[in-house]
């Protein structure tokens, strides 16, 4: 039987020698694929797709059939936890995620219940079990969650936001309530990731999409502290499951992030990979960081930019190739193939 620990992805995460740089793509199951759009249409809407384990399994497997990727990522949404807490998640056309019951005041935070994760999010774990059963045995499956801070942003703002005025007001004027909310979310995220691991995921990633809007001190207090808490709990129960942290626009805080005990850091395209490696490469693996906009260009440009990312990281293991954020819906699928082929062709020279 194939030992998943021998997969390129898990070896690179643990900074063990690899023959070439592994690659997967944030949002690799997504709207850029015509086959995904067909399944989503059949599901009726995005949330139905997330809540149907068979359909979630199908869209998770689609990019693996099309491309030689080194990992799959569970198809779900970061806002499943707030939905399970009773906030009423829905997706408005052209607006992204919204809540019918956002947290309007501190009373709502105090009365917010921590849900029973195994029951309320069973559809996620059913999907994970099904995917693990159906996907290639030699490929790892990545589970994920939003960070407590990022979930809190959506829950207090009521959806996406340009300026995050409400949540920032909360952390400045109602610190105690903010910490209460973040602690409830940290407990929920920990339970959520543990259930995903029990269902068969081989690594987990925490997406801190909005950590980069904070001041350095507020990042430490309101985002990093809670991710640290989650990593410590996960490592206590599952020391061998790698944990990846990703704070978008958080390149200035890599040293702090590396102190959490995580195994890898995601870096976005605004961060220089060579200097990131100098700063934290002795402690953690690095994942990233091609600018997603490159996939809208030409074959020559894609190959050149892939080469630049690989050269920037340099020789040796500890690098997982990825985009600096999620792939956009307008990317031609053939350009993804060009990127993957380029990683396969160019990266072996860095692993001699």
UniProtKB/Swiss-Prot annotation:
Pathway: Porphyrin-containing compound metabolism; protoporphyrin-IX biosynthesis; coproporphyrinogen-III from 5-aminolevulinate: step 4/4
Record has Transmembrane as a keyword: no
Keyword Lyase: yes
Keywords: Cytoplasm, Decarboxylase, Lyase, Porphyrin biosynthesis
Entry binding sites for substrate: 27-31, 77, 154, 209, 325
NCBIfam families: hemE
Biological role: Catalyzes the decarboxylation of four acetate groups of uroporphyrinogen-III to yield coproporphyrinogen-III.
Record protein name field: Uroporphyrinogen decarboxylase
Organism per entry: Legionella pneumophila (strain Corby)
């Amino acid at each position: 039987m194939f030992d998943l620990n021998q997969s390129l992805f898990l070896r690179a995460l643990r900074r063990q020698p690899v023959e070439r740089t592994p690659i997967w793509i944030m949002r690799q199951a997504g709207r850029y694929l015509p086959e995904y759009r067909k399944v989503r249409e059949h599901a009726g809407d995005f949330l139905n797709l997330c809540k149907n384990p068979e359909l979630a399994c199908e869209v998770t497997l689609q990019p693996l059939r099309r491309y030689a990727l080194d990992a799959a990522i569970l198809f779900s949404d970061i806002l499943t936890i707030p939905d399970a807490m009773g906030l009423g998640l829905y997706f408005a056309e052209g607006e992204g995620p919204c809540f019918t019951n956002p947290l309007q005041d501190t009373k709502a935070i105090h009365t917010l219940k921590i849900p029973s994760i195994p029951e309320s999010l069973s559809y996620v774990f059913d999907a994970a079990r099904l995917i693990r059963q159906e996907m290639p045995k030699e490929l790892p499956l990545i589970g994920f969650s939003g960070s407590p801070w990022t979930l809190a942003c959506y829950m207090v703002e009521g959806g996406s936001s340009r300026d995050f005025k409400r949540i920032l007001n909360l952390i400045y004027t109602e610190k105690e309530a903010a910490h209460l909310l973040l602690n409830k979310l940290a407990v929920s995220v920990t339970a959520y990731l543990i259930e995903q691991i029990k269902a068969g995921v081989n690594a987990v990633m925490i997406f801190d999409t909005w950590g980069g809007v904070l001041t350095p001190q507020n990042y430490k207090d309101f985002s990093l502290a809670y991710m640290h808490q989650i990593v410590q709990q996960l490592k206590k129960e599952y020391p061998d499951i790698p944990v990846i942290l990703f704070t978008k626009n958080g390149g200035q805080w890599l040293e702090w992030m590396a102190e959490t005990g995580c195994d890898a850091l995601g870096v976005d395209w605004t961060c220089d990979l060579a200097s990131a490696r100098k700063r934290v490469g002795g402690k953690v693996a690095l994942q990233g960081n091609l600018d997603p906009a490159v996939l809208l260009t030409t074959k020559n440009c894609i190959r050149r930019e892939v080469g630049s990312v690989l050269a920037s990281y340099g020789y040796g293991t500890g690098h997982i190739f990825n985009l600096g954020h999620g792939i956009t819906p307008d990317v031609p699928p053939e350009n993804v193939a060009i990127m993957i082929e380029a990683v396969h062709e160019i990266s072996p020279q860095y692993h001699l």
